[in-house]
Amino acid sequence: MASLSGSISSLFLKEFVGAFFLSMRYFFRQKATINYPFEKGPVSPRFRGEHALRRYPNGEERCIACKLCEAICPAQAITIEAGPRRNDGTRRTVRYDIDMVKCIYCGFCQEACPVDAIVEGPNFEFATETREELYFDKARLLDNGDRWEREIARNIAIDSPYR
């Protein structure tokens, strides 16, 4: 009796017909994938991507060399050298380096910064061919900040109620 039931099932291709209708149900739904290099998905305002140093609107860098980001970094990826005090009593950095090979993108540096100088921006496309290109110096970080300032400021404004 079991062989008769199996023969009838295989004769009418029960599994094939069931799989076909299952495929057709998903065939007409909206696609869930994107064509990545040409299309990009939405990125959250809290996304932690490539690091950037920000400037004030007058062009002066925000970093006050307090070294809180260097102290809180669990991967010890940040190195800061502070310059001498200026006439107005403030300090600025002489050297600000981030070893992106060590960085774990935890965002602690951004949370610790009292003046929002170091931020993790929206850029996630910064692959390199050599490890040396992943050692960001102050000039590269400031350049990133200048390039992404509009989006960084918008993301910080959106996230401000939760900070």
UniProtKB/Swiss-Prot annotation:
Its main location: membrane. Keywords: 4Fe-4S, Cell inner membrane, Cell membrane, Iron, Iron-sulfur, Membrane, Metal-binding, NAD, Quinone, Repeat, Translocase, Ubiquinone. It is found in: Cell inner membrane. It is a peripheral membrane protein. Disulfide bonds: none annotated. Binds 2 [4Fe-4S] clusters per subunit. InterPro entries: 4Fe4S_Fe-S-bd, 4Fe4S_Fe_S_CS, NADH_quinone_OxRdtase_chainI. Residues 53-83, 94-123 form the 4Fe-4S ferredoxin-type domain. Transmembrane segments: none annotated. [4Fe-4S] cluster 1 binds at C63, C66, C69, C113. It is an enzyme of class 7 (translocase). Coiled coil: none annotated. It holds the Pfam family Fer4_7. [4Fe-4S] cluster 2 binds at C73, C103, C106, C109. One of its GO terms (biological process) is aerobic respiration. Its EC number is 7.1.1.-. It catalyses: a quinone + NADH + 5 H(+)(in) = a quinol + NAD(+) + 4 H(+)(out). NDH-1 shuttles electrons from NADH, via FMN and iron-sulfur (Fe-S) centers, to quinones in the respiratory chain. The immediate electron acceptor for the enzyme in this species is believed to be ubiquinone. Couples the redox reaction to proton translocation (for every two electrons transferred, four hydrogen ions are translocated across the cytoplasmic membrane), and thus conserves the redox energy in a proton gradient. NDH-1 is composed of 14 different subunits. Subunits NuoA, H, J, K, L, M, N constitute the membrane sector of the complex. This is NADH-quinone oxidoreductase subunit I.
